[in-house]
Amino acid sequence: MGRGKIAIKRIDNTMNRQVTFSKRRGGLMKKARELAILCDADVGLIVFSCTGRLYDFSSSSMKSIIERYQEAGEEHCRLLNPMSEAKFWQREVTTLRQQVQNLHHNNRQLLGEEISNFTVRDLQLLQNQVEMSLHSIRNKKDQLLAEEILKLNEKGSLVQKENSELRKKFNIAHQRNIELHKKLNSGESTSSEQVTRSSKDPGESSTPRDSRVCIDLELSQKEVEDE
């Protein structure tokens, strides 16, 4: 037999009403959680039982959801009522103008202007404000100077490191150059010794052609002498 349809009206029996509330509340919380997860929705649910007990669920922060709801409601009201939106912006403009005037007035007072009606207490408060401003300015200046000094020290350390690396490379290149010169000088000395030894070696006789050239030279000299 099929389940009968429940009439949507207040349940008179207190026990049945509490049981139904517990079941429906659990299902509602489950659906809200599923909606937030499946649809990536920002969900906030608040339920008060007939006894005043609070039950709630929020996918993120309940406070942020409520604030967002209130802002959306105000925006919706402004869209529905253009005159209300115009008044809102008029109030904003008036507030901003007043803030600008106050800033100009305070600035003139800090410069020593418009203080003719000041009492001793007012002047003391203004002096304290100026001293606090100067203290903040000095602290900011000291902070910036310290940061600049730190940057310069870091750059100096980097330059020293680069110079050290260049000095090492120069020493290596200089040492290699010295070794290369030694090898070249050693090779030249060996070649000179070989040439000298070859010219002084008696074991190496002249070729017949060289002997003939020498004889011809001697004959030519004798002919010159006879003439």
Curated annotation (Swiss-Prot):
Query: What Pfam families does its record include?
Result: K-box, SRF-TF
Which GO biological process entries does UniProt record here? positive regulation of transcription by RNA polymerase II; regulation of transcription by RNA polymerase II
Location in the cell = Nucleus
Record's keyword terms, sorted: DNA-binding, Nucleus, Transcription, Transcription regulation
**Chief location category:** nucleus
Q: In which tissues is it expressed?
A: Expressed in seedling roots.
Gene Ontology CC, one term: nucleus
- Coiled-coil spans are none
Q: Which SUPFAM superfamilies match?
A: SRF-like (SSF55455)
Gene3D superfamilies linked to this entry: Transcription factor, MADS-box (3.40.1810.10)
Bias class Polar residues marks the residues at 186-197
Is DNA-binding given among the entry's keywords?
yes
Q: Ranges of Basic and acidic residues compositional bias?
A: 198-227
Residue numbers spanned by region Disordered: 183-227
Q: Which CDD domains match?
A: MADS_MEF2_like
* UniProt domain MADS-box: residue ranges: 1-61
The UniProt record lists the K-box domain at 86-176
Q: Which GO terms describe its molecular function?
A: DNA-binding transcription factor activity, RNA polymerase II-specific; protein dimerization activity; RNA polymerase II cis-regulatory region sequence-specific DNA binding
Q: What does this protein do?
A: Probable transcription factor.
What is the protein name stated in its UniProt record? MADS-box transcription factor 25
Encoded by which gene?
MADS25
